Amino acid sequence: MVGLGVFARKFFGSAYERRLKALRQKVAQINALEEQFQKLNDTQLCQKTDEFRKRLTEGETVDLLLPEAFATVREAAKRVYDMRPFDVQLIGGMVLHNCGIAEMRTGEGKTLMATLPIYLNALEGKGVHVVTVNDYLARRDAETMGKIFSFLGLTTGVILHDLDSDARRSAYACDITYATNNELGFDYLRDNMAFDRSQMVQRGHHYAIVDEVDSILIDEARTPLIISGPLEDRTDFYNLIDTFIPSLTPEDYEIDEKQKTITFTEVGTEKIEKMLEQAGHLKGKSLYDIENVAIIHHINNALKAHKLFVRDKDYIVRNNEIVIIDEFTGRMMPGRRYSEGLHQALEAKEHVAIQPENQTLASITFQNYFRMYRKLSGMTGTATTEAEEFSNIYDLEVVEIPTNLPIQRRDEDDEIYRTAEEKYRAIVRDIRQAHEKGQPILVGTTSIEKSEQLAERLRKEGITDFRVLNARYHEQEAYIIAQAGVPGALTIATNMAGRGTDIQLGGNVEMRIRQELQDMPEGIERTAKIEEIKKDVKQLKEKALAAGGFYVIATERHESRRIDNQLRGRSGRQGDPGRSKFFLSLQDDLMRIFGSNRMDGMLQKLGLKENEAITHPWINKALEKAQKKVEARNFEIRKNLLKYDDVMNDQRKVIFEQRMEIMNADDLIEMILEMRNEVIEDLVETYIPSETYSEKWDVKALQEEIHHLFNLELPVEEWAKEDGIAEEQILERISNAVTKLENERAERYSPEILAYFHKAVLLETIDTLWREHLVNLDHLRSVVGFRGYAQRDPLNEYKTESFELFQAMLRNLRRIVTSKLMRFEIIQQPTESLIPEQVDGNDSALNDQRKGNDSPLWMQIQENRVVVNPKDRNPKDSTTWGKVGRNERCPCGSEKKYKHCHGAFV
């Protein structure tokens, strides 16, 4: 009996089919306008932009303008590049405009498709950000698609790694801005460390289209963007800890490959304790005493560095530095560093220069950065497998865009061998057969090491005409990948290296023109050469088609089906024939970790001989099931991490909004008065609690605290002896005295200098306390997981305690700002040369490090501008103290060290 759901789908169509039907109706509207727009001359077509903008100001919406705007871009693309967007590209453009993810097969024209919603949303004048995974793609797309936008009267900018602040500001001011996800995130963080609004470069987060959206919002979701400053140098300590690890044996630790964790056994712990004791670094009797928390952390990092991180797979050593390799793309990520001492442990392991650890100055995850956009959309060739995550976390629906022509690629069943040696013999055999008939081949590997091992095998077998593309040679990446479709081409690539560059059968015409004619000037000769290249590519394509089309060979399955699908999707573009096959062995990581024993037993029962493979759809399904389990686990990890990051994100928003308010304000007196009043109220409530008898009042402590904070000698003890005096009266007298002192100080300076000083103190204090708060949150996050053993929810504990820490930070902020403003003397007016410049931290990728002093530039300048006037010291007047050493006795006469007395607030 047919189920009711099946019957309903047959009668009404699925939700996907209904959505496509609605989009096709819009496509029909756009197509109906085509003839009308073809009749417009270039000037009339360009004037459509001004017309649309005028209609928007008169109340029309971008949704209503969509058919005409898309028709305009389609006609412009035809005139500029002789490329007419297909109907399926119009569908994809509408999905992007409606804040969805367009899953579009490789070679179907995502870059051109994106111009449709980019143009439409840029008409609002609020800026459109097009996000790519690297500088090369950002520059390429800005240059090529920018010609279409320029034809229509829109401006296009591109953010590259080495741009200065002025160039970035200009690029963000354009109608359309192309940039990498890293540059966007770091610019946002730097903007929120600026001293003045004029130093900021971004102008808001209106609409973003994320190319390769799965790579950025899924693969990179757990990686925070961090701007950091160096801490003290501990090179000797890292080297010492590193010497302990080689003497450990497998019985000293346990590795969980599924969870990618490593822990010491009891035997290993005892061994490490003895080593530390001999080296004089063990505090107390046990490694797990509270005093040894930091040492445990460093030892665990050293163990991870040696046993979990593999050279040429997870990182490479280049120019005496550790360079991380992206596990998903195989690309190097220069400048990115592991945090919390792990990178230093790797440097000690490889005996390269150890860079100091860094303190986080500001951070944000891609998850929270991209959720700031009012409108967010994305495009990729593979997103369906992660549809649930896109929906739950980003509220983005994945829509599979139909191909313009039917897919003719043949995806063959996996071949599974007992050992890796047998598998590689079969791969070489298969490569030889396909290579001899001139079929273009792409071989995908999972690491640099494996790509180079395969290359060496091929050389020994007499196959030498091939290109290796991995993190070592990423500079040639785009060109190598672009020509991988030439007949007889054999390319070995790590994972998805070259992603974003189209592999066309016969080769990439545009890439060849750029490469071969880069020095040839415009003219008849160049035009003739271009025609010659086009003719040659056409002939080469026919040869490649005759050889069977593009052949993708995978040497291993990835944990994620999506990465496998990306590799497969390289073949069969735009209706071309092709095939794909995965070669596996029971020694592969995925097979070994997830149930190879069971499969090994099954293969033995089948009597599988050496060099024989088993091929069956059932095995493909079993592997897919294992991959789904891994994907589900990784999704849960990312979702859980986001819950914790959301807590910090809420606090980050408060701090950044407060900073923005301070930067934009011309006069901060009202904010400062509010802070001061809250500090006084807190003081009085602490020492003279409301609704208590005067006998319970600690007026002496209150009097000392007032002197400590405000540099005021007030007779609070005398006031408290007056008959019938209430706490409200004491509060009022303190407030009046502080106000009087403030007014006297304010009269000494011009309003401009005072306002500048107020801003400097507020921003410097906020930034300092926020940095300390981030460290506290990291520490809390690292220990809160253990609360689960006490039947307490770690997330709720984290929320509660992080809120308490945040409240304490805000109280501390009010106290420190109030005290500083009551104690400092301004003796030098700021000059033009001292006006702060934008801080550029462009030296790195995901961990942006400041050079030298870890304070922003304006904070360093401030030390030259705001100083204490040295006179003979009067214990009751801190303005006479001059510079006091941190460990000197405090001049106030308390006999305490300065850093524990008045110096605590200076």
Swiss-Prot record:
InterPro entries: Helicase_ATP-bd (IPR014001), Helicase_C-like (IPR001650), P-loop_NTPase (IPR027417), SEC_C_motif (IPR004027), SecA (IPR000185), SecA_DEAD (IPR011115), SecA_motor_DEAD (IPR014018), SecA_preprotein_X-link_dom (IPR011130)
Similarity comment text for this entry: Belongs to the SecA family.
Residues at which ATP binds: 89, 107-111, 502
Binding site for Zn(2+): 890, 892, 901-902
SUPFAM superfamilies: Helical scaffold and wing domains of SecA, P-loop containing nucleoside triphosphate hydrolases, Pre-protein crosslinking domain of SecA
Gene Ontology cellular component list: cell envelope Sec protein transport complex; cytosol; plasma membrane
Primary gene name: secA
Enzyme Commission code(s) on record: 7.4.2.8
UniProt-recorded name of the protein: Protein translocase subunit SecA
Protein function: Part of the Sec protein translocase complex. Interacts with the SecYEG preprotein conducting channel. Has a central role in coupling the hydrolysis of ATP to the transfer of proteins into and across the cell membrane, serving both as a receptor for the preprotein-SecB complex and as an ATP-driven molecular motor driving the stepwise translocation of polypeptide chains across the membrane.
GO BP, sorted A to Z: intracellular protein transmembrane transport; protein import; protein targeting; protein transport by the Sec complex
